[in-house]
């Protein structure tokens, strides 16, 4: 029997055999069309990601840094001739007027903050500015006292505070803000030093009695990071690890769809399930699947030592890993990943039903790139075209995660609301997407 089947088999031919002429033409056409579509898609979608970083340096002024002079402006240290504050303000104005690339320095009056440096700290924590340079009320008074009273314990770094909050966006801080602030600080010290020495030479007879640190550098900066980005193992939880959240949500469909399909396939032993109830089952089972998948996804962060039991900290004090919800932070973290996975996964499932395979992989690439571009990078530094990124799921997930893990300024209510809107819209579209899939299957298109 096998020998007979082999005798009847059509013999294979070479690639350029005339018998394959029509097949070759069809294959070449389909190959060219598919590759062209892929090339156009790659050009278009990757341009979204590259465009997010295009001309970022020219938009650095969007990163606001307040410079507030309290020197000699409070009752305890009031003076008519402060030195430190005016010198810093003068150098700030030079930075603002400079054609060189720099952050968005803004000179603010102390009265705007009720002459209270702690109010400035609160404003930075509340994300009204990325950083603040505060010239302390006693900056000039302490410096002069060190020279007249020969105070050997004088600390130059007590003159000026630099307030940051790197957990807000570590990439932006480390790439742009901190390097520019370092240049600013060096410029202030280089400018103030000669001016101060000249002042001492004119008004002081015995320079040798002055503490060395009061001569040089005379003033300095204390950097206060309200919410440091630490430990390093937390980075995947708010960056690359979230890409896997999208991918896991996407592959929920091809793994579970064959299981769901058994309910609507009639057989001699069982009738098909009614379509409305089948859709309800699919939505509910997907939510349950996301529940368990997000739990094990969250367990990875717990297993590798990301803190989830630290107490919250006051907004204006520096604190590492000040978990916003104390010992309940892991549960909130898990719930956010659950809701986030649903917000990311349901659109994937809808598009998988509408587009079918392999074209649904296009949507996965688009979904990953647009979410990563607007979730991992500062939208403020991108073109106004990218403002839609504020409404994209991953941007909201990242923002809420930073609140849970580091205790940054909370907008977690808005973050969850946006994610629930994504889920609601996706579920509303779910029946239509399912109808399109079944319509295509009946015609053999899927």
Description of each model-found segment:
Residues 1-233:
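Extracytoplasmic/periplasmic domains immediately adjacent to an N-terminal transmembrane anchor
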């Amino acid at each position: 029997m096998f020998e007979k089947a082999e005798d009847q088999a059509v013999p294979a031919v070479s690639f350029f055999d005339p018998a394959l002429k029509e097949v070759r033409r069809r294959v070449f056409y389909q190959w060219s069309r598919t590759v062209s579509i892929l090339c156009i898609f790659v050009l278009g979608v990757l341009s979204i990601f590259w465009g997010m970083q295009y001309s970022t340096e020219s938009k650095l002024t969007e990163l606001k840094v307040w410079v507030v002079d309290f020197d000699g402006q409070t009752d305890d240290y009031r003076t008519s001739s402060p030195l430190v504050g005016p010198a810093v303000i003068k150098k700030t104005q030079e930075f603002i007027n400079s054609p060189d690339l720099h952050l968005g320095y803004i000179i603010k009056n102390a009265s705007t903050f009720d002459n209270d440096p702690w109010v400035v700290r609160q404003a930075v924590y509340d994300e009204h500015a990325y950083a603040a340079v505060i010239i302390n009320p006693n900056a000039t008074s302490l410096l002069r006292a060190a020279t007249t009273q020969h105070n050997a314990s004088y600390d130059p770094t007590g003159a000026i505070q630099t307030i940051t909050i790197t957990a807000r966006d570590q990439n932006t801080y480390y790439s742009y803000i901190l390097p520019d602030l370092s240049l600013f600080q060096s410029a202030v010290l280089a400018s103030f030093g000669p001016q101060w020495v000249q002042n001492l030479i004119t008004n002081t007879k015995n320079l040798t009695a002055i503490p060395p640190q009061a001569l040089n550098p005379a003033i300095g900066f204390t950097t206060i990071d309200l919410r440091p980005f630490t430990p390093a193992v937390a980075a995947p939880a708010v960056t690359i690890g979230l890409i896997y959240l999208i991918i896991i949500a996407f592959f929920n469909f091809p793994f579970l769809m064959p299981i769901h399909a058994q309910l609507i396939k009639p057989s001699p032993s069982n009738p098909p399930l009614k379509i409305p109830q089948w859709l309800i089952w699919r939505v509910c089972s997907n939510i349950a699947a996301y529940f368990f998948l997000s739990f094990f996804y969250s367990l990875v962060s717990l297993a590798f030592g990301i803190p989830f039991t630290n107490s919250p900290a006051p907004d204006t004090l520096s604190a590492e890993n000040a978990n916003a919800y104390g010992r309940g932070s892991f549960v909130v973290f898990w719930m956010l990943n659950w809701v986030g996975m649903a917000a990311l996964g349901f659109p994937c499932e809808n598009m998988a039903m509408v587009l079918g395979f392999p074209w649904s992989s296009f949507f996965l690439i688009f979904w990953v790139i647009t979410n990563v571009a607007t979730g991992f990078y500062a939208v403020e530094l991108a073109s106004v075209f990218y403002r839609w990124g504020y409404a994209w799921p991953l941007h909201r997930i990242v923002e809420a995660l930073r609140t849970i893990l580091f205790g940054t300024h909370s907008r977690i209510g808005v973050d969850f609301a946006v994610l629930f809107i994504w889920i609601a819209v996706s579920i509303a579209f779910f029946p239509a997407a399912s109808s399109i899939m079944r319509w295509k299957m009946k015609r053999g298109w899927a």
